[in-house]
Amino acid sequence: MERVLSNTQMRAADAYTVKVQGQSAQTLMARAGAAIADEVEKIMKKHGFKSAVVVCGSGNNGGDGYVCAESLKNRGIAVSVYAVAEPTSEECILARKACTAEFTHEINADLIVDCIFGTGLCRDIGGKFAEAVNAVNASGAYVVSADIPSGLNGDNGLIQGCAVKADLTLVIAEYKLGHFLNDGLDLCGKTVKKDIGIICPQTTYAEIYSDDDLKPFFIGRKRNSHKGTYGSANIIAGSSEYLGAAALACGAALKSGCGYVKLTTAEMVKLSLVPVYPQVIFSDGIDFNSHSIAIGMGCGVSKDLYNKIIYILENYEGALIIDADGLNALSE
């Protein structure tokens, strides 16, 4: 399980680490830049890349880039810096002054490190910043984004004007909501989290689970067992308009390990489902003896569906999933 923070929560974690834990913002930037350089060095060795350019913005994400460039230079890697704009944050100003890497006016290298904007971006990108983003995307180079692809909103994963499409995103400290929402799923590429010592004081946050987190819930079946050993589910799904919804729902229930899957649906849906999942049992009504009930998928919004959901809510004590048209019916 990994924490997933909003932009506000991440800023609070940064402030807590600086003010309460006594770590300076410059120290955190030094760690972030070094962590980015570590990963860039690995990638360059793996792919045989000969050159890198770090594209730096004017804020702290740009500061991370200057530190990264200096670290790569000290390791003997051919690296240059493309400064999109003059530094504006105190930490970025100091990082640029300390950077002795060569500066360039071209975004052209085997590998590009995107340090233009981080999660602090609160406007659509335009002007020279948009030109830099578009140049990165048009370069054909391997692109590594620091924390989040520039131009991607850290809260909702939407593009703000334009955005970098990364091959790899090095997530600093904690994952952000934008990594997993909307355009973030297409722009982040592979994600790798880098711990730089930022402390998260929040106790309430979103979470994301990996395959390893979920494996304990999918136990192997014992030989001395039968379908009834592994629970039952009643799926109320599908209609003449949405034949496939029932198949998708039943398939998901079976893949979860459910022993008995009972489907309540229209006659034509039954005929289409038998060749796909012959083990599914058909039921004409609601089975309140099932361990779980799922309702709404492809049913079509109707008063009848609404009444069924209310009836189940009032009379059923097992696990209940209301999805798709079920939610739409309740909202009307």
Range-by-range predicted roles:
Residues 1-83, 179-324, 328-332:
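Small-residue (G/A/S/T)-rich helix-start motifs and N-terminal tracts that mark the onset
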Residues 38-116, 124-146, 316-318:
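Nucleotide and nucleotide-moiety/phosphate-recognizing core
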Residues 87, 151, 268-269:
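Positions that flank functional sites
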Residues 96-99, 160-164, 187-188, 277-282:
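Short, hinge-like loop/turn segments at secondary-structure boundaries
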Residues 106-110, 163, 287-288, 313:
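A short, aliphatic-rich alpha-helical micro-motif
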Residues 110-111, 116-205:
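Internal gly/pro-rich beta-alpha loop/helix module
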